[in-house]
């Protein structure tokens, strides 16, 4: 699932490197590097120091974490891993209420580590819904965090955004018809888009072909969801789609164009496939999806061909404290053995 960069030095192939050749070797432009989401809802996970070592050994150059953790941030010092750091939804009210609160958050969780931790993005909130009580605070929190980062002298290094999911779409088929739901736009999304355009920051989108497939298996084939279709499945004007992931991303691009955000880029902040516990879950399906995902995003989408799509694979480990059952099995690695669950070979 993760996107790994090859070192380009075959002579360094030690026993550890042989283990990780099972995982993705990726060479491409900087923006095409992919990361892995490091969720921590498990009681058997490796220590943060061990996790950072595993990222480095596997050549995973980008990480997403779902909230600031001093333990994790300390472990990242000097690692050269680029970080997507979330601000949890329950922090939005506090950060929107006061610039001082935002300044303190940035000082405590970014500035104090920025000399040797490579912060790439801050995601202010994750999958905020219009009905959430904190939705009204999202845009003010974005603005306050942006000012705090700029005041800390990090404005050229750290981009501020938020992550939505494809449930924000009113239409997604065909992709060119993509549009956002009016309640999302009214609650916060129009303000988010204006903010991102003004600050030249990407929109983050969690894209799960798994959920789209399991919600509608009559109309969506498993091959289309797993990037296995041998030919075009959806013809949308001059653009042909052979997989659901590209169609989903391009539907968001189309929706952005209709909402004044046509200049924005997308970062896929989560995507993956579970290996057990639910419909269409297996090691083979997880391996197939994630292998093909990493290959596919290097090339862009039909709407934006040749523009590599920065993507974060979900997730680094199986997390045994999540529910329902299938939510426990998205990991690339076993948390106990710290070994890959299946091979993904891009050589």
Swiss-Prot record:
UniProt PTM comment: The N-terminus is blocked.
Which sites are catalytic?
Answer: 127 (proton donor), 270 (nucleophile)
- KW Hydrolase (keyword) present: yes
| One of the GO BP terms on file | carbohydrate metabolic process
Instruction: Give GO cellular component annotations, separated by semicolons.
Output: vacuole
- Keywords for the protein's UniProt record, in alphabetical order: Glycosidase, Hydrolase, Plant defense, Signal, Vacuole
Q: What induces it?
A: By ethylene.
Single GO MF descriptor: glucan endo-1,3-beta-D-glucosidase activity
Cysteines joined through disulfide linkages: none
InterPro entries this protein is in?
Glyco_hydro_17, Glyco_hydro_17_plant, Glycoside_hydrolase_SF
Q: What is its EC number?
A: 3.2.1.39
Q: Where is the protein found, in the record's own terms?
A: Vacuole
**According to its UniProt record, where is this protein mainly located?**
other
Catalysed reaction(s) here are:
Hydrolysis of (1->3)-beta-D-glucosidic linkages in (1->3)-beta-D-glucans
Which EC class is this protein assigned? hydrolase
Q: Where is the signal peptide?
A: 1-32
Q: What does this protein do?
A: Is thought to be an important plant defense-related product against fungal pathogens. Is capable of releasing soluble and highly active elicitor molecules from fungus cell walls.
Similarity field: Belongs to the glycosyl hydrolase 17 family.
Q: What is the name listed in the Swiss-Prot or TrEMBL entry for this protein?
A: Glucan endo-1,3-beta-glucosidase
* Organism for this UniProt entry: Glycine max (Soybean)
Q: Kindly list the organism's lineage.
A: Eukaryota, Viridiplantae, Streptophyta, Embryophyta, Tracheophyta
């Amino acid at each position: 699932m993760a996107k790994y960069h090859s070192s380009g030095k075959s002579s360094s192939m030690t026993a550890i490197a042989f283990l990780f050749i099972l995982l993705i070797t990726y060479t491409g432009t900087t923006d095409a590097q992919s990361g892995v989401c490091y969720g921590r809802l498990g009681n058997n996970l490796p220590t943060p120091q061990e996790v950072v070592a595993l990222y480095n050994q596997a050549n995973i150059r980008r990480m997403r974490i779902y909230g600031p953790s001093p333990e994790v941030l300390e472990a990242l010092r000097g690692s050269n891993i680029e970080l997507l750091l979330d601000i949890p939804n329950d922090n939005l009210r506090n950060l929107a209420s006061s610039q001082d609160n935002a300044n303190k958050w940035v000082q405590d969780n970014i500035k104090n580590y920025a000399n040797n931790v490579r912060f790439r993005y801050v995601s202010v909130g994750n999958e905020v819904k219009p009905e959430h009580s904190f939705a009204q605070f999202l845009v003010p929190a974005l603005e306050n965090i942006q000012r705090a980062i700029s005041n800390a002298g990090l404005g050229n290094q750290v981009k501020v955004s938020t992550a939505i999911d494809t449930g924000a779409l009113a239409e997604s088929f065909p992709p060119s018809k993509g549009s956002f739901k009016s309640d999302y736009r009214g609650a916060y999304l129009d303000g988010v888009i204006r903010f991102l355009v003004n600050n030249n920051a990407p929109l983050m989108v969690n894209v799960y072909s798994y959920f789209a497939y399991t919600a509608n298996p009559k109309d969506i084939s498993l091959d289309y969801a797993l990037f296995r279709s041998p030919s075009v499945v959806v013809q949308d004007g001059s653009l042909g789609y052979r997989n659901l992931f590209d169609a989903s991303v391009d539907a968001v691009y189309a929706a952005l164009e209709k909402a004044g955000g046509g200049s924005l880029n997308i970062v896929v902040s989560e995507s993956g496939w579970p290996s057990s516990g639910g419909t269409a879950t297996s090691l083979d399906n997880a391996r197939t999806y994630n292998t093909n995902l990493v290959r596919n995003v290097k090339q862009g989408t039909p709407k934006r061909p040749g523009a590599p799509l920065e993507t974060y694979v979900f997730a680094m480990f199986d997390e045994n404290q999540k529910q329902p059952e299938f939510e426990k099995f998205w990991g690339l690695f076993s948390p106990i053995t710290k070994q890959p669950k299946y091979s993904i070979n891009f050589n």
